[in-house]
Design a protein with these regions (language model features):
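Rossmann-like AdoMet
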Residues: 1-64, 81-117
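The AdoMet/dcAdoMet-binding core of the Class I SAM-like
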Residues: 58-166, 185
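A short glycine-rich, Lys/Arg-flanked "PGG" loop and its adjoining helix->strand segment in the class I
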Residues: 184-197
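Conserved beta-strand signature within the Rossmann-like core of class I S-adenosyl-L-methionine
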Residues: 198-205
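Class I S-adenosyl-L-methionine
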Residues: 207-248
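N-terminal Rossmann-like FAD-binding beta1-loop-alpha1 element of flavoenzymes
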Residues: 250-277
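Glycine-rich FAD pyrophosphate-binding loop
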Residues: 270-290
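Dinucleotide-binding Rossmann-like beta1-alpha1 core, especially the glycine-rich loop
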Residues: 295-331
Length: 331
């Protein structure tokens, strides 16, 4: 992997066609079918992976995890959020969504998409925390029961450190003939290894190399009726009976109610744990309450380094969740 020379990756280079279909100039491909973008995504991915049917079997403290290759405009994610929020779930059940994207779509293009599909409300939740295009993992809490892990950068560089068990995989990269890196066997092997027994994979393409690779790595593969004018699509399943994953709730004591202690307690509670906060004073923050202003800044280097990239992403995360009056910009 080449060392980066800038902290920010460029946004996706997009041209809007006369019928309001976005076209990725770098990959010479469209982001969705002009026959119906929302219906296409709903049919291929949400229905292909049976997500709503499986959600109805979740138990208290369950975690349902989806992994997507090719986040793009976030249509699959926004539709999944809308579906999740449209029905009740057991106590402390949560949706985890892991998505990879080499080039984020700009906020301007995202807003145009939302206007076309009536997704303004769902997009607003995401845009409030939408990161600058800094490579790496960005954790975005859409709600207490919905967490998006948006991973920016080349997927082969980023996925090496992934440790997750997922219930469904949306394979939604650009067409294999234009984006071979998103469909090669090394990546597919890693993805399949993360899939839980009974977990499903869905995609719009029926390319022979993809079918053979999924079968090679142990999945049962079938062709299904495609969307619109497309004759076929692929659905694959890992052998075994699918069961909801349960999150182990722990009782945790955090000692110290300073800034770090409060943030740790908040993070643990958000993940469903039962937290007790212990401090020698009766008020949170103690002496820090006397401070009228604080300055938060990342430690950066002249050129991006692993540690400075981590600091920058942590800084962005802090700003997203503390409702601070931030100023300045990242360049």
């Amino acid at each position: 992997m080449k060392s980066p020379t800038t902290y920010l990756l460029p946004y996706a280079d997009i041209s809007w066609q006369p019928d309001n279909t976005p076209y990725a100039n770098a990959f010479e491909d469209i982001y969705w079918s002009n026959a119906g973008g929302l219906e296409e995504k709903q049919y291929i991915f949400l229905e292909g992976c049976d997500v709503q049917y499986r959600w109805r079997t979740l138990t208290p403290n369950a975690r349902f995890t989806i992994l997507e290759t090719g986040f793009g405009f976030g249509l699959n994610f926004l539709l999944t959020v809308r579906a999740w929020q449209s029905e009740p779930h057991p106590q402390n059940a949560r949706l985890e969504y892991i998505a990879y994207e080499q080039h984020l779509v700009s906020p301007h293009d995202l807003k145009k998409m939302a206007g076309l599909f009536g997704l303004e409300a769902e997009l607003e939740l995401m845009l409030e925390q939408y990161p600058e295009p800094v490579p790496g993992n960005h954790t975005i809490w859409i709600a207490d029961d919905i967490c998006l892990h948006l991973v920016v950068g080349e997927i082969h560089d980023q996925i090496e450190t992934l440790e997750a068990e997922v219930d469904g995989i949306y394979l939604d990269g650009f067409t294999p003939s234009q984006n071979d890196a998103m469909w090669n066997e090394a990546l597919l092997s890693k993805l399949v290894s993360c899939l839980r027994p009974g977990g499903k994979v869905s995609t719009y393409t029926v390319a022979g190399a993809l079918r053979r690779a999924l079968i090679k790595y142990g999945l049962t593969v079938e062709k299904a009726k495609g969307f619109g004018r497309k004759r076929d699509m692929l659905i694959a399943e890992k052998p075994g009976d699918w069961q909801p994953a349960s999150h182990n709730i722990k009782k945790i004591i955090v000692i110290g109610a300073g800034l770090t202690g409060l943030l740790c307690a908040k993070a643990l509670r958000r993940r469903g744990h039962k937290v007790s906060l212990v401090d020698q004073t009766s008020e949170p923050l103690g002496a820090l309450r006397q401070i009228k202003q604080i300055a938060i800044y990342p430690q950066l280097s002249k050129t991006p380094q692993p540690y400075s990239n981590l600091y920058l992403r942590a800084y962005q995360y802090f700003l997203r969740h503390q409702a601070l009056h931030a100023c300045g910009r990242i360049e």
